[in-house]
Amino acid sequence: MSTASRHLLAISSGQKSVINHGSRSIETAIVKQPLAGAVTISPLGIEGDEHVYEHHGGPDMALLIYPSEHYSYWRSVGLQLHDAGAMAENFTTVGLLETDVAIGDFINIGSVVVQVAQPRSPCFKLAARFGRKSLPVEMQTTGYTGYLVRVIEPGVCEAGDALLHESGTAVDRISIADAGRILNVDRHDIEGAQRLLSVTELGETVRSTLTARVAAGGQHGEDVDRLYLD
């Protein structure tokens, strides 16, 4: 895809709500709705975009970006995706897939500048929303997770704005696709984890997970239960 065609397709936010799955009621803010017009982006993301858990959001996870190119795949395997934001993302993009961006890269959108911090680690709430228990694992194995960014320069952006991609300064440039593989799939790749830890701009949540993993010599006591819906 040419750089000229990369753009922001939609901006979405969500509030806390309850979704039902079998006999369970699950509180979540995973249901996002597209916003119209120009949207102000602060250091913590979109005002009014709620999070149920304290460890969701924060400077390293201010916004979730999801490439719209993945929607056709998910529809082909049976997911009913309608509006942008269906995969719980804040920014739905055309272009800049997980293979295109690396930890520490910058993206200029309108007057906003964000920096790529870490791959997304999907959880069971996506499974509950779509009634598909395997969905979080499928997202990890396909690599179609999206990625989380920190806000470097707050400002205003809107759907249709161009995405201007700038490489970061990391000596070892690790794509989100590779970072996601190391974090979410190949959990015994200690060498890969050490490489990822060498990138200063890596988000602190992932850094904490990988530091413990390396110290243990492999996956140890990690929260893989987040993937599974009872």
Question: Residue spans of the language-model regions?
Answer:
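Short hydrophobic beta/alpha edge segments that flank linear recognition/processing sites
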Residues: L163-S167
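Loop/turn positions that initiate beta-strands
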Residues: G104, P154, E158-D161
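Active-site glycine-rich loop that binds ribose-phosphate moieties when present
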Residues: F130-V137, T141-V151
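Electropositive, beta-rich accessory/interaction domains or terminal extensions
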Residues: M1-A128, S134-L135, G168-D230
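Short loop/turn positions at the edges of beta-strands in beta-sheet-rich folds
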Residues: G95-L97, G143, E153
